[in-house]
Amino acid sequence: MPIQILPPILANQIAAGEVVERPASVIKELVENSLDAGANRIDVELEKGGCQLIRVRDNGGGICGTELALALARHATSKVATLDDLEHIASLGFRGEALASISSVSRLTLTSRTAGQHEAWQAYAEGREMAVTVKPAAHPVGTTVEVLDLFFNTPARRRFLRSEKTEFAHIDELLRRLALSRFDVAINLKHNGKLLRQYRPAQTESQQEQRVVQACGAEFMQAALRIDSEHLGLHLYGWLAPQPLTAINEVQYCYVNGRMIRDKLLNHAIRQAYSECTGTSFQPAYILYLELDPHQVDVNVHPSKHEVRFHESRQVHDFIVQVIRQALQTAYSENAPDAVFSGIEDAAPDYPVSPLKNRATGQHQYSAPTGGYSSPSGSQLRSYGQLLTSELPSIPVSREAGSVAAPDNSDWPVLRLIQQRYLLSAQDDTLYLSDLVAIQSLQWLTQCNASFNEGLIAQPLLIPQRLDIARPHEWLAEYGIWLQKLGLRYNTHKNKQIIIQAVPALLRQTDMASTIPAMLSLLERYPVALSHQEWHSFIATWLKLPGLIPHHYSMDSARSLWLWLQQNVADWQNNTQLMRSVDLTNILEVFSRD
């Protein structure tokens, strides 16, 4: 067969294979066109799940009569004109092929009127050459697109359509996603003559929450946290649920600059944040909106525009992880037990440990507070990914004669993690339950006590955090040596406010809005002059503050703590503050009586 130019109808049908998958695909293209036209009311009418009729009417700007024929032509659009326009796409549509593709596999009629016209015009395309006919019509300002008999001329495609109920479910879900993307737009849905969905405009926060309830259910809204964070041109806001929901429907909606997407990078960031905070894997529920400079995101990478590509993908990923993680930690800390492992301070001398090698490579210089703060450098941004995804560091140890030899793990196997806090293990015929919070507290006590000379290592924050400290800046200057040793780096802001730039690893995964003020309140009890004795006393008391030591662990972090315990603590098997044997006597007696 010789090479030849395809006829217009065949070329459009090939393009429709990517654009028009099912009735929901048609509605997506038409509703997005309405949103781009500035409509604040969109009415969608269906018959037979959209297979027989789709009608989308809006009150947008409309299309003038002289451009209706072009609107049905391929690659004709008013949204982009030059290559530069592709670098900062702000509209939902931009390829100019949706109407042409839809009209090639259906009987499509386009009716529109602009505010400057006295009458409306109607256009439709038919025949092998897709010739467009335009005639006068009656219509208010806005546009109506009517699609009849979808896939009537492509029987193979029509056979792949599902039942009326299934196709309507896809459309219902699509309009739910669109309704959550534009709270200011009224969207109504009729099916077979019945009004089934009516999303009213939502301007205030309470009205927006009501639309979320309508779209996602009351359970999600009752459990959801409202987040709103902005940094370095990235703005993330929306709702997320800290706990699994019992509802069958998944609530997982992401929007980038108002465009609904399903992006692997965003999904990974969200799941990572949940995993780090909960230690478990479950289906999180969220509605999140990310806004950034259109120059920093490429939306022209997927046929249906469901995926995007970020120019600074690592920065976007880490920003999302940190914002969500901070919100979840705040929620979890409110419900966490107030007391952390008691008795650390008194029992500390009874825990002989191996001496530690100094982890710092040099003395950290303390900078005098300044009036502002600068954005992280490029090298800092590249390091944030490692800082944000790593576990709390374990302690490097140097063995000397007399230190405890690590036992053979096969003789003391780990069985399972209980309530994300307790580790069940076994030796011979005895079961043991270890308190991971107590072990973690001891690990940090050991590390902090050994860090007096070099101080705790300061790790930069991706998002500098503004805090109210209820103390004048002069007080901070007096305790400058203490704050330097504790790894806290900050810049002054307004009176009794500071911008936190870097924190020690111990604080990095906590709710710093509460843990740092609590640390400063504790520090106020100690003299300005720093000594070994005061340092050890402060650290032991500091570790008891609520919200500092995590109460949820993954199996990997639990095993890491278990290994540290065996290698660094003498006579750990007999330390009842760290672990206890499980008494099975009563249970065995019951079984023996049976």
Curated annotation (Swiss-Prot):
Coiled-coil regions listed in the entry: none
Alphabetized Gene3D superfamilies for the sequence: 3.30.230.10, Histidine kinase-like ATPase, C-terminal domain (3.30.565.10), MutL, C-terminal domain, dimerisation subdomain (3.30.1540.20), MutL, C-terminal domain, regulatory subdomain (3.30.1370.100)
GO biological process: mismatch repair
UniProt GO cellular component terms: mismatch repair complex
Annotated keywords: DNA damage, DNA repair
A Pfam match: HATPase_c_3
SMART domains noted in UniProt: DNA_mis_repair, MutL_C
UniProt GO MF annotations: ATP binding; ATP hydrolysis activity; ATP-dependent DNA damage sensor activity; mismatched DNA binding
Similarity-based family: Belongs to the DNA mismatch repair MutL/HexB family.
Record function comment: This protein is involved in the repair of mismatches in DNA. It is required for dam-dependent methyl-directed DNA mismatch repair. May act as a 'molecular matchmaker', a protein that promotes the formation of a stable complex between two or more DNA-binding proteins in an ATP-dependent manner without itself being part of a final effector complex.
HAMAP family xrefs: DNA_mis_repair
Protein name: DNA mismatch repair protein MutL
Organism in which the protein naturally occurs: Tolumonas auensis (strain DSM 9187 / NBRC 110442 / TA 4)
Species lineage: Bacteria, Pseudomonadati, Pseudomonadota, Gammaproteobacteria, Aeromonadales
